[in-house]
Design a protein with these regions (language model features):
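Catalytic cores of carbohydrate-active enzymes
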Residues: 1-123, 211, 218-221
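Non-catalytic C-terminal accessory modules of carbohydrate-active enzymes
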Residues: 11, 15-18, 88-227
Length: 227
């Protein structure tokens, strides 16, 4: 029964992938539904499209630096940018202050998230837009979201426009504290590891095993991390 179920599911997925591509994919441009409201991000998340689909997504949000997405699309958009190593584009979107951004609401003095990021609407209670916040400790500090473990692997990223960051998370109830500061192309990366945790850092393709207590690493950024 298990194999039959798997075969059926695979067949359904193949059918719908083909149907969605036929209905929405523009073979001339490489985009789905003209890329409106993060359509290309949804396609990439489903394993659809080609290299142009990613290129179009990056180009659009590099220029606009604003969200035209709903709360699900906002999450998927940021997720896909990060999944394809477009950290700077994602960071620019999340830190923007133009109309249609989180910073725009903050600039207006709002303390909650509107239903539409670019239009003042009757509903000012859409906290689900804030789901993208989960990427901040994971990406900026490298803290994994798997908390019930004593094996912790840090994979930090360093956005071009961010000079420093700090934060912590608990693993098996024990803290890992991270803080870093950037000077030119050099990162001073400090980590406190609680007793009983095995922690390592992966950066620039190199793995460094940390010891309990205070650790400090000097990381040289690669050229493509500052472009």
């Amino acid at each position: 029964m298990g194999n039959v179920g798997c075969d059926y599911t695979a067949g359904v997925c193949k059918h719908y992938r083909k149907s969605v591509t036929k209905a929405f994919f523009d073979d001339k441009t490489g985009s789905f539904a003209d890329g409106v409201q993060g359509a290309d991000a949804f396609a990439l998340a489903a394993g659809l499209g080609d290299r142009r689909t990613l290129d179009n997504l990056v180009a659009k949000y590099t220029v606009n630096r604003r969200f035209d997405t709903g709360f699900i699309g906002t999450y998927v958009l940021v997720e896909q940018l990060l999944a394809h190593d477009k950290v700077d584009v994602a960071f620019d979107l999340l830190s923007a202050t133009v109309k249609g951004s989180f910073g725009y609401l903050k600039r207006l003095g709002e303390t909650t998230i509107w239903e539409y990021l670019d239009t003042k609407w009757c509903s000012h209670a859409h906290p689900m837009f804030g789901a993208v916040a989960e990427f901040l400790p994971k990406v900026l500090l490298g803290l994994p979201d798997k908390e019930r473990t004593n094996e912790v692997v840090l994979r930090p990223c360093f956005p071009r426009k961010l000079s420093h960051a700090e934060g912590s998370a608990l693993y098996d109830g024990k803290p890992v504290e991270v803080r870093w500061r950037k000077t030119n192309n050099t990162i001073r990366y400090r980590v406190f590891v609680a007793n009983g945790l095995n922690v390592s850092v992966i950066c620039n393709g190199k793995t460094t095993v940390l010891s309990e207590g205070k650790n400090e690493l000097t990381i040289q950024l690669l050229d493509n991390e500052n472009e």
